[in-house]
Amino acid sequence: MSCVDLQLRGPTACVDEVIDLVLAATQRCGSTMILEDMRNAHVFGVPEEYFIPWYKSEKIVHIERELNSIVRKSKGENGFSSVKIMADQLQCIERKLIESSAIGATQFLPNVAQLFKDSKWIYIKRNDTLRQAISRHMSTETKVNHATQNKDDNHFAGNLLQGYSSSYNRDARYDFQKIKRHCQNIVLENIVWSNFFSVNSIRPLVLSYEDLCAQGNCDYLNLISRHAGVDFSVEEDSFPRRRMVKLSNQKNDK
């Protein structure tokens, strides 16, 4: 059993086990689709956005206990664990971790890097920034982030529409200034990830949402398995179907 030491405001915290895989993402980049495929494979742990509560840092008091809880929840039956982190969560996580004296002052997000120093990384990108920005705007307008194909489909995603309807965003209004701000935020968030990887000498596996959609299958999981050192190969004939469907429709394209 391995252990990650963090210098906190009290005794040294020891995270019982390393999180094996971290998925780096930005909001509405298509990462939930990838998480569903990974969960369906049953070898990549139980990836989820476990750091959402850290947005409200006053709720996170016992760091060691919180981190060990995340490790336990993110672990699959084979002992492999994985989490997803959004770019805008990085500073929230960093603020809750006290800098180690061994970390150079010039390092970018040093405590996050220290926490995941033994983890493998995947960077999920969406090439079309404008479509990603429109997707963010639509989710704000409709309060819907994800949808399933059928009403009786269960899914782990939040803000879920069970049973997709193309009229879900019928009353949504376009706002050029808001979409422009979303575009700017997406660019900045991707810069944050690029800087984090560069400064901390991390070489992630990069996945493009558009490429995966064009591929039309789950063969990309073989890339993830090789990157993460997991014994797995996709068998398309028997691999579970996705319950989640695209929200994008003609209104998004106007």
Regions found by a protein language model. Give the residues of each.
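PAPS-dependent sulfotransferase catalytic domain
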Residues: 86-199, 204, 212-233
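Residue-level "edge-of-site" marker
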Residues: 51-52, 210, 237-240
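PAPS-dependent sulfotransferase catalytic core
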Residues: 1-87, 243
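C-terminal accessory extensions appended to soluble enzyme cores
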Residues: 1-8, 230-254
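Hydrophobic residues at beta-strand termini and immediately following loops
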Residues: 207
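Short secondary-structure transition/capping segments
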Residues: 58-59, 217-218, 245-247
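Alpha-helix termini
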Residues: 43-44, 141, 214, 242
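Short low-complexity, flexible loop/linker segments enriched in glycine and/or proline
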Residues: 61-63, 221-223, 249-250
